[in-house]
From Swiss-Prot:
UniProtKB keywords: Endoplasmic reticulum, Membrane, Transmembrane, Transmembrane helix
Record's keyword annotation contains Endoplasmic reticulum: yes
Stretches that traverse the bilayer: 83-105, 120-142
Name of the protein in question: Uncharacterized protein wtf12
Cellular localisation: Endoplasmic reticulum membrane
Polar residues bias: start-end ranges: 1-10, 58-69
Organism in which the protein naturally occurs: Schizosaccharomyces pombe (strain 972 / ATCC 24843) (Fission yeast)
Chief place of localization: endoplasmic reticulum
Membrane topology: Multi-pass membrane protein
């Protein structure tokens, strides 16, 4: 049986396969000297090095909140029209709470004559007022973050943790390794003395 296989490779493809590392690619130019001890261990024409260079140079600070155009627009509107922004937030809060309130009131209203119905109605009014208050005080979208920052501050519990750690470590019968946290570095040989043998 005869095989009628025809190669799909052109003569240019075959020449590329036979190229040695000493030839010059006319599109890219001669390869510069590559120092593997430098910042990058990738060759200069590597596709990976091109992808790695897409990150901006000043990425040490991380992404900024103003990079999002929606945040910029909202901040600009808030700065230009502070009264309208507050009224708009109030309107959204009242509409959201009214939908929840009237839906729940429709479910609780038949039970209003019983003790359970009265308690449920007052709990419903209390929760509605609480939702309205939280919506007016906090920024939309940042509720969890804002509550934590307002309750414990921006620095978290740093001062309290520092005080507690100092009190624990200053006691005479305290072993410092028992109170290691994520900020404490313990060498591996101290954690596993058997590995030294």
């Amino acid at each position: 049986m005869k095989n009628n296989y025809t190669s799909l490779k052109s003569s240019v493809d075959e020449e590329d396969e036979l190229k040695t590392g000493h030839e010059i690619d006319l599109e890219k130019g001669p390869l510069p000297e590559h120092n593997s001890e430098g910042e990058s261990t990738l060759p200069p024409y590597s596709d990976i090095s091109k992808l790695a260079n897409l990150v901006p140079e000043d990425s040490s600070t991380g992404p900024t909140e103003t990079a999002n155009p929606n945040v910029e627009r909202r901040q600009e509107f808030k700065d230009l029209h502070p009264n309208i922004y507050s009224l708009l937030r109030l309107l959204i809060a009242v509409l959201a709470v009214s939908v929840v309130f009237f839906t729940a009131w429709g479910c609780v209203n038949p039970l209003e004559k019983s003790t359970f119905g009265k308690i449920a109605f007052f709990v419903l009014i209390g929760l509605t007022c609480l939702i309205l208050l939280i919506t007016m005080i906090l920024e939309p979208g940042l509720i969890g973050i804002s509550i934590m920052k307002r309750l414990i501050g921006d620095n978290g519990n740093d001062e309290r943790d520092y005080f507690v750690e100092n009190r624990l470590l200053s006691s005479p019968d305290c072993d410092a390794r028992q109170h290691a946290n994520s900020d404490t570095a313990i060498p591996l040989r101290e954690m596993n003395p058997e590995s030294e043998a």
